[in-house]
Amino acid sequence: MATFTDAEIDELFETSGTVIDNIITAQGKPAETVGRSAIPQGKTKVLSAAWEKHGSIQPPASQDNPDRQDRSDKQPSTPEQTTPHDSPPATSADQPPTQATDEAVDTQLRTGASNSLLLMLDKLSNKSSNAKKGPWSSPQEGNHQRPTQQQGSQPSRGNSQERPQNQVKAAPGNQGTDVNTAYHGQWEESQLSAGATPHGLRSKQSQNNTPVSADHFHPPVDFVQAMMSIMEGISQRVSKVAYQVDLVFKQTSSIPMMGSEIQQLKTFVAVMEANLGMMKILDPGCANISSLSDLRAVARSHPVLVSGPGDPSPYVIQGGEMALNKLSQPVPHPSELIKPATACGPDIGVERDTVRALIMSRPMHPSSSAKLLSKLDAAGSIEEIRKIKRLALNG
C-alpha cells in the first residue's frame, strides 16, 4: 500500500484545483474538430510548405508577362516616361494569373486534406482576392502615387537589381512603349494603406521576424477527460489512505493503556506469588511441598480404614493392659508417653525446615538459593535462621 505525506497530499489538492480551474475557464472546442485535428497525420509538412508558398506569391502587378519581357528585350531602350497622377493601374488584366495560381495552390492543398480544411482554404482564398481588389480600386490611391520624376533624387529605390520584387507595370495609357518602370507608389501604398493586406510586398530590410515551422503546432485539448478521470482516481485513493490512517490511529491509541495494564498484571502476579509462599509456610503439613505436582501426589495418597476390632496383641502389655496416647491411639511401649521435662522454646529444627522449603519455592537464581541453603545449614540459632528467612523473602 502506497503511503503519502502531508506535503504530497497538499500538492495533489493544489494540482487538482488548478486543473479544474483551467477546465472551467477553457474555451470550447470547435464543432468540426471533435477533439481531433482536422489535418491528417503525415501531411503537416506538405500543407505548411504549400501555405508558405501561397503566402509568398507576389501580386500580379509586380510580375511581367513572358511575351512582354521578350518584346522588351528585342526592342531598343527608350527613355522612361512619366506616369500621370490620374491613371489607375491595370487590374482586370492581372486577375486571370492570380486565379490560376490560387487554383494551383488549392489543388496542392486538397491532397490528403479533409473537407473542413478545404472549405477553410477556399474562404481564405476568396478573402485574399477581395483584399487584392480593394487597394487598387480605392479612390484615395492617387494621393499615395508619386510621379516618376522624383525617382531621380532617390536612385537607391530605382535600383531594380537590388530589389527586383519592387518592379511594377506601367500605366495602361503608356502600354504602347512596353517599358518596365520602378513604381514606388505601390510599395508605399502597401505600407500605409489600412485594412487587410495579405499579399504585401517583401523587403529584406523589414524582415525582422523569424519564420516558424508549422510542424510543432499544439494538439487539440482532447485529454481533459483523461485528466479528470485520473484526478478522480487520485482523490479516491487519497480518501482511502486517510480512512486507513484513521483506523491505524484508533488501533494504536490503546497501546499505552495496554502497557499500563501489563505492568499492573505483573504487580498482581508478584503479590499472588508472595501470598502463596506465605500460605505454604503457614501450612505445617505441606512444608516440604514446593511444586504443584508434589501437591497433587500428596493429595492422591489417602489413608485406608480397616473395619473391625483388629488385632490388639501388639499393643497389649503385661497384665493385659494397653497404653493409649492423647488421641486414644494404642502405643506399643508406654515409655513413649513419658517425655522429659525441657525448657519451652521454639524448635530450631522445625524453623530450619520451614525456611528451607521457603528458599526452594522462591523463583531465585540457583547460585543464590544454594548460598542461602549453605547459610541455613550453618545457622545455629533462631535469630540467624530468621535473618536468612528475610533474605529469602526480599530476594
UniProtKB/Swiss-Prot annotation:
This is Phosphoprotein. The keyword Isomerase does not apply. Residues 75-101, 127-180, 203-212 have a biased composition (Polar residues). Residues 46-105, 127-181, 193-217 are annotated as: Disordered. Homotetramer. Interacts (via multimerization domain) with polymerase L; this interaction forms the polymerase L-P complex. Interacts (via N-terminus) with N0 (via Ncore); this interaction allows P to chaperon N0 to avoid N polymerization before encapsidation. Interacts (via C-terminus) with N-RNA template; this interaction positions the polymerase on the template for both transcription and replication. The N-terminus consists of a long intrinsically disordered tail. The central part contains the coiled-coil multimerization domain (PMD). Forms a four-stranded coiled coil structure. The C-terminus constitutes the alpha-helical domain that binds to the nucleocapsid (N-RNA complex). Essential cofactor of the RNA polymerase L that plays a central role in the transcription and replication by forming the polymerase complex with RNA polymerase L and recruiting L to the genomic N-RNA template for RNA synthesis. Also plays a central role in the encapsidation of nascent RNA chains by forming the encapsidation complex with the nucleocapsid protein N (N-P complex). Acts as a chaperone for newly synthesized free N protein, so-called N0, allowing encapsidation of nascent RNA chains during replication. It is found in: Host cytoplasm. CDD domains: MEV_P-protein-C_like. The gene is P. It holds the Pfam family Paramyx_P_V_C. Residues 222-285 are annotated as: Multimerization. Keywords: Host cytoplasm, Phosphoprotein, Viral RNA replication. One of its GO terms (cellular component) is host cell cytoplasm. Belongs to the rubulavirus/avulavirus P protein family. The keyword RNA-binding does not apply. It comes from Newcastle disease virus (strain Chicken/United States/B1/48). Residues 65-74 have a biased composition (Basic and acidic residues). Transmembrane segments: none annotated.
